[in-house]
């Protein structure tokens, strides 16, 4: 039996969600890839994620988003009664289909509703809306830790299919992501925060980061007008991706001499 606990609330007045923390491997085990929205796994990225989660000093990621349909054996009336109970701040302590749900309303303080969801993972499997790559690396991760999760509760499978597509779309299209160049510049120009040794050894970064930093400091691109024209405002991206390619192909070693060989 698996138990997930957290705060039960309508997120931004829309989706009913259970938000909390749970064991990483447990979340991976009780959830599955959602073919409606998930991209195919890239094995190389899976390995990088596993290394990061096993050894990364800066190990962190946002909550994984999961979904579940509460409909089971045509229990439409019970599902509607549950949503009405939540909407009217009532208490609940009974099975809803294959899930045992308990809701406790606090009369004082911040008014948060604590809820516990218990279910048999051989019967109930959660769907992954966002975070599939992170959860799929669990079989290669040796350490144990908790991660934040958001479980979106749906009235039926049709609603779950609609909600998961909409949420996946909003997560991946509504935000304005930083360009890779801006991300790299933050790391490579912050030597006081991220030493050369950290760049070399921490799985969050790697030798390509270190060599890109060294190259950016020591190469005057104005002396190479054609290259300068090509990379324009993406110097750090160009250097990092170039060193990634050279290191992965074996043309350069993961050693300080690599920069001299590059020149």
Task: Please describe what each predicted stretch is.
Residues 37, 41, 121-129, 159:
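Conserved aromatic-histidine-acidic binding/catalytic patches
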Residues 1-118:
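N-terminal extension/subdomain marker
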Residues 49-56, 138, 171, 215:
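Hydrophobic, Leu/Ile/Phe/Ala-enriched alpha-helical segments that form helix-helix packing faces
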Residues 67, 128-131, 152:
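Short His-Asn-centered micro-motif
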Residues 122-125, 140-263:
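Solvent-exposed functional surfaces
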Residues 43-47, 132-135, 165:
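A structural signal for well-ordered alpha-helical segments within the folded catalytic domains
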Residues 72-75, 135-137, 157-160:
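Short catalytic/ligand-binding loop motif for oxyanion handling, primarily in non-cytosolic enzymes
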Residues 118-140:
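A sequence-level detector for short glycine-anchored, His/Arg-bearing signature motifs
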């Amino acid at each position: 039996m698996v138990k997930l606990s957290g705060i039960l609330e309508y997120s931004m007045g829309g989706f009913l969600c259970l938000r909390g923390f749970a064991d990483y491997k447990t979340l991976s085990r009780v959830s599955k890839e959602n073919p409606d929205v998930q991209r195919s796994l890239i094995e190389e990225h899976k390995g990088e994620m596993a290394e990061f989660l096993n050894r990364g000093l800066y190990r962190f990621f946002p909550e994984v988003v999961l979904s579940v349909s509460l409909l089971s054996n045509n229990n439409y009336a019970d599902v509607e009664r549950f949503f009405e109970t939540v909407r009217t701040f009532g208490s609940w302590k009974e099975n809803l289909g294959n899930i045992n749900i308990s809701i406790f309303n606090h009369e004082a303080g911040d008014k948060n509703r604590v809820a516990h969801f218990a279910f048999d993972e051989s019967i109930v499997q959660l769907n992954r809306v966002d975070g599939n790559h992170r959860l799929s690396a669990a079989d290669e991760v040796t350490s144990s830790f908790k991660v934040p999760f958001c479980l979106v509760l749906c009235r039926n499978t049709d609603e779950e299919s609609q909600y998961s597509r909409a949420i996946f779309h909003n997560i991946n299209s509504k935000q304005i992501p930083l360009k890779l160049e801006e991300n790299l510049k933050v790391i490579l120009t912050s030597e006081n925060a991220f030493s050369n040794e950290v760049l070399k050894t921490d799985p969050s970064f790697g030798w390509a980061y270190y060599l890109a930093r060294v190259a950016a400091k020591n190469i005057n691109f104005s002396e190479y007008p054609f290259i300068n024209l090509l990379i324009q405002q993406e110097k750090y991206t160009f250097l990092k991706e170039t060193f990634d390619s050279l290191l992965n192909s074996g043309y350069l070693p993961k050693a300080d001499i690599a920069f001299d060989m590059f020149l």
